[in-house]
């Protein structure tokens, strides 16, 4: 049981689902934002801490991973061009959760370090409102590359195996799909390749590394890959 006790909680009130706040511990998001003041940037040493993020604990007790500032920035910016082939001004979408390492690295830090647009999406690949949700986002925002989990594409494949929703949208700006977070089964990869007609890349990394340590690099040179493996055959 944690000995540290939370002093304040900031709650975002969703329309139609408002809750009564327990003041003074619970405060309204809108009130906090409206009262916010601009804070100047603070100069830090490159070896100081950026954040602590805990691992999932799948194989044991969760471990607090400490990330430094300088090396983290250099590595993430390098990956955006060399692994994902993303340049300044491109539209990038990492369909993950900011609380996970993918969200930390590739919703927030990496795209902003690189100077590209990062898409934030709240919803599911199906049911919000249908199996065309991802295609609509890619089409509306002219997304160049998407990073998501294989489960998302398995869900889309199950709901729309023939890709009927896909045909409703213009994905002419879309160049690549990256999968990670779990095993990407060959059937799902092949289905996505046949539908999207772009490279579908299964790559591997973990919270401890903060970026991919096994991947095809679309910004350097694509190598032949065996289905079910992350990168080189």
Model region roles, listed by residue range:
Residues 1, 64-66, 117-126, 201:
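Short beta-strand->loop structural element characteristic of the AMP-binding/adenylate-forming
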Residues 116, 144-148, 157-225:
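Gly/Ser/Thr-rich phosphate-binding loop
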Residues 73-91, 101-145, 158-164:
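Conserved AMP-binding/adenylation subdomain of ANL enzymes
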Residues 41-44, 226-232:
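Short Gly/Pro-enriched turn/cap motifs at secondary-structure boundaries
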């Amino acid at each position: 049981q944690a000995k540290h006790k939370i002093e304040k909680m900031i709650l975002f009130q969703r329309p139609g689902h408002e809750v009564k706040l327990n003041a003074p511990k619970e405060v309204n998001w809108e009130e906090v934002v409206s009262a916010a003041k601009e804070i100047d940037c603070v100069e830090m040493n490159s070896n100081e801490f950026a954040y602590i993020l805990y691992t999932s604990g799948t194989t044991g007790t969760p471990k607090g991973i400490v990330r430094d500032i300088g090396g983290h920035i250099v590595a993430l910016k390098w990956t955006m061009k060399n692994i994902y082939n993303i340049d300044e001004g491109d539209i990038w979408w990492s369909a993950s959760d900011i609380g996970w390492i993918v969200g930390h690295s590739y919703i927030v830090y990496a795209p902003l370090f690189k100077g590209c647009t990062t898409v934030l999406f709240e919803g599911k690949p199906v049911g919000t409102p249908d199996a065309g949700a991802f295609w609509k986002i890619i089409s509306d925002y002219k997304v160049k590359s998407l990073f998501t989990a294989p489960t998302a594409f398995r869900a889309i494949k199950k709901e729309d195996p023939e890709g009927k929703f896909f045909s409703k949208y213009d994905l002419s700006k879309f160049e690549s799909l990256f999968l990670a977070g779990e095993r990407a089964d060959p059937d799902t990869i092949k289905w996505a390749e046949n539908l999207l007609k772009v490279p579908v890349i299964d790559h591997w990394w973990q919270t401890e590394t903060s970026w991919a340590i096994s991947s095809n690099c679309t910004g350097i040179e694509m190598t032949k890959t065996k289905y079910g493996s992350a990168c080189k055959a």
